Amino acid sequence: MNSNRPLSPHLQVYKLPLTGLISITHRITGVALSAGLLCIVYMLVMLSLGAESYATLQQFMQYWPAKLVYWGFIYALFFHLCHGVRHLIWDAGKSFDKHTLQQYAVYELLASLLLTFMTLLLLYKPEFLWMLDQRFQK
């Protein structure tokens, strides 16, 4: 065997572009959403079992690790949605130049963060929606 052959560098040497990281993250969020849906089905089963299991579920959802997983699921959902919209744009044959790919990757990250923030705001502070409604009626 020839030992003078060049070795391929390890993955730590490569600096993936943002679009590559987004693509990998899209696949990871797809798997996470599948696991999250199993958790949601389990929660629905607990809800259907009666008041005692519902109280247990409420108590469990008060712990910060459970909230962190819940918030992560919401972010993964919106990230996956935004990347899906990006794929629809690509299916239309648009936005294939390098600059636009980078630009849309940043937009995708910002949109998913904004949608997550707005969802959490409406979940934890529903009066915010009422305040917006009052402001726009004036």
Residue ranges and their predicted role:
Residues 1-138:
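Membrane-embedded alpha-helical bundles that constitute the cytochrome b-like, heme-associated redox core
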